[in-house]
Every structure is written in C-alpha cells, then in structure tokens.
C-alpha cells in the first residue's frame, strides 16, 4: 500500500504530520520514538528502518518489489474510516487543548471528509470527553498518564 502511493510530496506531508505530533507530545510532556526527517523519504517510509534495520532505505528513484498485498480498493477502509475520526481527530482536539497548531492533521480530517462526502469529525464519538479526559488540567492528565490516578469531573 505505502509503496504504491508514496512519493516525495506525500513523504513531505508525512514528515510535517510527524512534526505536529512531536510538538503535541512536547506540550503534553510525553516521549516519542525518534524518527528523522530523512526517514520519511524512502519507499518504505519510516517503517523500513524500524523493521529492517537502521541502515535500510529504498530511494524513490529505485523500484522495490518487496511489498505485500494490494491495499484497499476504495476509500471505505480503516486507513480512513478509523485513522481519521479516531487518531487524527483526537490529536486535533489535544492540539486545541494544549495550544498546539495542527494544520496538517486538521487538513487530513478535512480532505478525508471531503473525499467520503461526510463529516468524519462530527460522526466520531472519540472526543476527549468520551475518553473522560476533556475536563482534566495538564497536571491532572500527567498524574493520570504517569501514575494512573484519575481525577473525575
């Protein structure tokens, strides 16, 4: 799937998306694995190095035959119907809560909604309130994440 749809322009979007995730993680004081900007610019994306070793990369100028499966055949698949209204939408909400701009993440929500002709964010039940963390301050959320101490509304 990634190997057939990936090109330098899409890799740039992925890298910028990752930068927004890193900014959000920093604001929330949580750690993330290290992914370098250059790691996105491979036919195997950042996952090539993760699964095949730190020196593994396939430049866009080279053909790579080692892809499995054909990927989805339409837009009604989990890469959109789950990743966007759950992952992207929650990151967008956390960005608003923490004052972190998420224009790339927000654009993913808008583009996916436009392609599917429905509002994926409005349809999503996955809000910070649904997770019962919307009311928490930064300090309370830290206590919950690090110590498991939940502060109810």
Roles of regions detected by a PLM:
Residues 4, 8-153:
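NAD(P)-dependent Rossmann-like dehydrogenase/reductase catalytic/cofactor-binding core
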Residues 1:
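A conserved mid-domain beta-alpha-beta active-site/ligand-binding segment of alpha/beta enzyme cores
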